UniProtKB/Swiss-Prot annotation:
Subunit note: Has multiple subunits with at least A(3), B(3), C, D, E, F, H, I and proteolipid K(x).
GO cellular component, one term: plasma membrane
Pfam families referenced in this protein's UniProt entry, alphabetically: ATP-synt_D (PF01813)
Keywords: ATP synthesis, Cell membrane, Hydrogen ion transport, Ion transport, Membrane, Transport
Compartments, record wording: Cell membrane
GO terms of molecular function: ATP binding; proton-transporting ATP synthase activity, rotational mechanism; proton-transporting ATPase activity, rotational mechanism
Main location, first listed in the record: membrane
NCBIfam families: PRK00373.1-4, V_ATPase_subD
GO process terms (BP): proton motive force-driven plasma membrane ATP synthesis
Protein name, per record: A-type ATP synthase subunit D
Functional summary from the UniProt entry: Component of the A-type ATP synthase that produces ATP from ADP in the presence of a proton gradient across the membrane.
Amino acid sequence: MAELLNVKPTRMELLNLKRRIQLAKKGHKLLKDKQDALVMEFFTIYDEALQLRRELNLKMKEAFEALQMAEIDVGTLRLKEISLSVKPNREVEIRKRNVMAVPVPLIEAESFKRNAGERGYAFVSSSAKVDLVAEKFEEVLDLAVRLAEVEETLKRLAREIEVTKRRVNALEYIIIPRMEATVKFIKQRLDEMERENFFRLKRVKALIEARGGS
């Protein structure tokens, strides 16, 4: 049996508890609907994250293969010198947006892809294979930024799902059962008190009638 609330067994408390139960059940339904919607949104974004992860792994494989070919073409030392002369790429700005009322990051950044002239290294000291390396790693950066946003969104949604689940369970298995058990107890206690009063009044009436007849 659920633990009872510490309240007086009065009709006022009974009415108050019934109202609280109605509100708790409405709150439970709203939270359950929110939980279900969050879970659906989570798995939608999870599918996107899996796809982005697969694409990123493929792009990284292509980028490192291109890097190996460039090292063979111009040499490791020269490739390092070229990499040090590359101009910084785009800046990334992190804002916030809401997904199912959950604040999640929104990474605002232009594509990292640039043409060879924007990268800053001299054409005469470079090669087509070096350009390909830069191109491939810029593609990696684009995907990595998008994946970071999606994975952080998943983490925050997962936390919100867990918090909502705990609230749903608390209402469903603790709070509402305690109030319902207390309502049942108060009803039983009020019935007992009513019967006691009835028999008390009956005895008083019998005594009065007995005295009146003597």
